Amino acid sequence: MELVIGRVVKAHGITGEVVVEIRTDEPDRRFTPGASLRAKRSRDGGTGRNYVIEGVREHGARLLVRLAGVNDRDTADGLRGSLFVIDSADLPPIEEPDTYYDHQLEGLRVRTTAGQDVGVVAEVLHTGAGELLAVKCDSGEVLVPFVGAIVTSVSLDDRILEIDPPDGLLDLGS
């Protein structure tokens, strides 16, 4: 499974740098000189092309990245909208208990401790107050806080996430 770690926003300057919106918790690990990244055009869904990073510098909340073979503004601008992706198999295993990568939770069936089917985790949202699971259900979408008091168990093998929702939480999607 491919995971997006960055998106090319635009070209920067005339020497071929690109502005990259960071979409990873580990930008220092992913965007380092000498590292190879695969860039895919978001609209054509092809296999993409590999690039070697020649240089990286911070630019506010974004990065300015120089890629081998991208030496002018026109070439850099041609990458606008491209997504930098990695294979989920390349991620290190998580050592901490009850900690998951977003892609591991997305697609899990959600049910209550009473056995009621709720829906499927569509997305993990990261907010200032913590993580929320966007659960797609028949009546729409319900946001479930990803906290131990509500999420009682996660079984990646069985693809099931069990919750003990407080009264009214599941009514919000109706």
From Swiss-Prot:
Stretches assigned to coiled coil: none
Glycosyltransferase in keyword set: no
GO cellular component terms listed in the entry, alphabetical order: cytoplasm; ribosome
Keyword entries, A-Z: Chaperone, Cytoplasm, Ribosome biogenesis, rRNA processing
Pfam family, one: RimM
GO biological process: one example: ribosomal small subunit biogenesis
Keyword Secreted among UniProt keywords: no
GO molecular function ontology, one term from the record: ribosome binding
Cellular compartments annotated: Cytoplasm
Chain ranges of the PRC barrel domain: 97-169
InterPro entries attached to this UniProt entry: PRC_barrel-like_sf, PRC_RimM, RimM, RimM_N, RimM_N_sf, Transl_B-barrel_sf
Superkingdom of origin: Bacteria
Free-text function comment from the UniProt entry: An accessory protein needed during the final step in the assembly of 30S ribosomal subunit, possibly for assembly of the head region. Essential for efficient processing of 16S rRNA. May be needed both before and after RbfA during the maturation of 16S rRNA. It has affinity for free ribosomal 30S subunits but not for 70S ribosomes.
Record note on quaternary structure: Binds ribosomal protein uS19.
Domains (record comment): The PRC barrel domain binds ribosomal protein uS19.
Family: Belongs to the RimM family.
Protein name as it appears in the record: Ribosome maturation factor RimM
Natural source organism: Mycobacterium ulcerans (strain Agy99)
Gene from which the chain derives: rimM
